[in-house]
């Protein structure tokens, strides 16, 4: 018999791989490590509400802006263009332009579906109910994607961002320790970063301080807070352009060495920006971010190049966070923090301690039972269990997976699954031995008889783990991940690894006089 065989080589390789990649996580040395989840590491947990009505309003605002710009280009005379949650409305001044207007609306419709109502020269346009529902769903997905993008740029490891309910999002941020980190993360997440260029209503702005929102609305304008000068400023309600045309944002320093955010527009945005500034020299244009006016300079000349700056007495950190928010894209809808909960690191440590005690305690009891009941066969099974644990930790570390409390429960469960596989193998071997067969044949038949049952049960469990991971959320994913890895590891260690050890020991086993020492079988071989 050959001492070394393919199965034993695989087992030794699995052992070396498991130990090698587990050391950084277990001993806190350099190398790939397992990331601890919120429940083990501590951090910030938030429940956010997405105001999808605002997404619909913003959609209609963008549509109204595009309609106004393109109608002017095509010399279609429109009056009183207004936008609200119910859609947009306007008046066509020249009935002869009706066909051109219909063609323009069809062009602006794109892949969406409009409901267009016409009463004489008055038009109203809105999305169909199906399109509105689709917009709300897509808004949730867009907000989730943007939050993940921002948190990645912020430098947080393994944030968990998932939809919860119809219009709510759960955000888990492991590792948030200080109040400053909490504040920055919260501000970065909740910032809509909705950038707009809007014209100042020069005719009525002098009365802005004494004006109500309703009075402004009747004028086709909107009252916003002026962050630069204080008070209020009256702007034309239909924006010139918005942040959808923004391509880049970065922190630069002005002539006073103060941090400001420089932004760049795409080709379409640059053209609209240039056309408007060229046609409105001497008038003011406001840079609006999240419904707050940061500056409203007088246009001195046509502004080409499609770039601008946002200043507002920012700190370097604030300017950096704003640039991240702008680069990652504007949220179609504002979000509101509905619930905030801090998980302290002490709670995480308690969870780790309790879980480790449960895991180690259960592991020792299992190994004790296996060694007492199955003798040396039980010891070999225990070796497989140890390698199984190392493999789980190693694979999670290699892929940078997050370990959660349910994940640790999954590890405990896989220990039971691995034990079950070894028990089936040992019982099949003992059955053949009791029938009077030799050790070599008993081991061979034992593995053949046990393998089918082990594969069937493990593959079924693996399919369940994959489905749980694919369709589950948060804690369920953590449980499914460790269970799935553990199942694959148990197949390698129980079927391949232990059989390799037996094959290496066959010369000794063939000569043994006591089956009890090796397999716990009390009767002796004939």
Swiss-Prot record:
Q: What highest taxon heads this organism's lineage?
A: Bacteria
Keyword terms of this UniProt record: Cell inner membrane, Cell membrane, Membrane, Protein transport, Translocation, Transmembrane, Transmembrane helix, Transport
| InterPro entries linked | Acrflvin-R, SecD, SecD/SecF_arch_bac, SecD_1st, SecD_SecF_C, SecD_SecF_C_bact, SecDF_P1_head
Q: Where in the cell is it found?
A: Cell inner membrane
Q: One GO CC annotation, please? A: plasma membrane
Q: Quick check: keyword Repressor in the entry?
A: no
Query: What sections of the protein cross the membrane?
Result: 8-28, 356-376, 379-399, 405-425, 453-473, 478-498
Q: Name one GO molecular function term.
A: protein-transporting ATPase activity
Record membrane topology: Multi-pass membrane protein
GO biological process per UniProt: intracellular protein transmembrane transport; protein targeting; protein transport by the Sec complex
**One Pfam family from the UniProt entry?**
SecDF_P1_head
Similarity comment: family membership:
Belongs to the SecD/SecF family. SecD subfamily.
Q: What does this protein do?
A: Part of the Sec protein translocase complex. Interacts with the SecYEG preprotein conducting channel. SecDF uses the proton motive force (PMF) to complete protein translocation after the ATP-dependent function of SecA.
Subunit comment: Forms a complex with SecF. Part of the essential Sec protein translocation apparatus which comprises SecA, SecYEG and auxiliary proteins SecDF-YajC and YidC.
Against PANTHER family, the record matches this protein to:
PROTEIN TRANSLOCASE SUBUNIT SECD (PTHR30081:SF1), PROTEIN-EXPORT MEMBRANE PROTEIN SEC (PTHR30081)
Query: What is this protein called in UniProt?
Result: Protein translocase subunit SecD
